[in-house]
Amino acid sequence: MDRKSISIAGSGKVEGGVYDRVKISGSGKVTGDVEAEEFKGAGAVTVEGSLKAGKFEVSGAFKAEGALEVEEGEVSGSFKVEGPVSAQELRISGAAKCGPIQGGYIRVSGALKAKGDIEADTVRLSGAFKVEGLISADRVEIHLEDRSKARELGGETIQVRRGTAFGGLLSTLGRLLGTHGRGILEVEAVEGDELDLEWVVAEVVRGRVVRIGPGCRVGRVEYHESLEVSPEAEVGEEVKG
């Protein structure tokens, strides 16, 4: 049975269901859960339920009152999902607020607030974030523009730096707001294989090869192979195991 497509231009409302393509331009609302091969929105888009899509692309203001499950997602603007987010590949540029995130490749450039863990193969965060759980991935890359917080960081390779990795907009905005260059990450623990950290405040850091760079304040470092500590960092205790 062929799936039909729906389109809203201007202001409108459609019922949830299973579709081929959903396209909303303007102010649109979907009442109930929706599943589509392709979901595109530009403007103010609200889903009163959960959304499952193959390709997901929105710009403007998007809100889902349930969960979000996509294969490939691109978001620009305001992004709010009440439930969990699952994606093979997800790129967000703007302000995002959601439940736990799980996926393959996750990139957020802007401001992120996640109620739960972020678990993926690769996580790249640029800007400022607050993650109530842990950030866990094979590769974690963080570029801090402002004060950020997570419970724990875990991964094979973890790198934390100040500054913007994915363009100059956040850097320009940070300078205008007076927060540029003040990025710092607060966590309880960092654990991985190769760790390269700057401007991290942590109770404990555990790794095989560890670099504690400028701006770090760490209570205890446990390392297996090598440890490098910057003179501009503070470490309470160093333990080789």
What are these regions (language model features)?
Residues M1-G241:
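Extended beta-solenoid/beta-helix repeat architectures
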